[in-house]
């Protein structure tokens, strides 16, 4: 079962002849015995999304006929450019988690939460990453997920202290690596926690990202907490970026939409990143 409260109510359906209420979806009821903390939204039937990421269906908040502000393309090299949404099957499908481009020799890696994706080869899947996505537009394009790397303690045992994943992306239609287009953030795996961080995530019920800055709190040797209102399902995988621009956490869950958690990125994250880097570099188009 997921780690975030699963939506169980039905939204009001749009009334005929001019009503502008949102179209309703019915989400599957949660199992009574399971914890409810995940912030991943259900991505329909894609083989690339993990079971936890499939349990809370997104509900679009924009009413039929409503207008949204135009998308603005952020300049490359900043978080607004290299942070994006994960989609099950192109931009016409649901977005269910958030991911961030991370600097790597192959220039083709993103980091997200482990419960967002399935470990292993995903070359036959359909999930894509859309950096800087907003209002139905992906200004930089989309990149297909090829391979997912997770710690065995998460992939086989779902230990929350290891809820982290890296994904290798295929080149886009023009043969470009994602980092060459959007820029990327540096991953810090020295175990930093309890610092001011800025977090950008994609709520599943919206078509624009949500950003907040606050001071994280170290909860234990392996967990840290970030208190900021309105980080619901879909924001799983959001990078916690410190003031020096480095990623020191990745949003994995929270008991409410106002409390978010991350593992402390220590030795296990360094080992996993090394594994992903080796695989991604070997598979990069230029062999870099």
Functional labels for PLM-detected ranges:
Residues 85, 109-111, 165-168, 198-199, ...:
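Structural recognition of the beta-strand scaffold that forms the well-ordered cores
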Residues 145, 160-229:
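Chymotrypsin/trypsin-fold serine protease catalytic domain
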Residues 230-251:
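Catalytic nucleophile loop of clan PA
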Residues 3-12, 17-86, 265-288:
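N-terminal low-complexity, Pro/Thr-rich disordered segments
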Residues 69-81, 87-90, 127-174:
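Conserved catalytic-core segment of clan PA serine endopeptidases
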Residues 133, 155, 255, 272-279:
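Terminal interaction modules at protein C-ends
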Residues 92-93, 106-107, 116-119, 135-137, ...:
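Solvent-exposed loop/turn segments at secondary-structure junctions
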Residues 76-133, 216-220, 252:
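Catalytic histidine site
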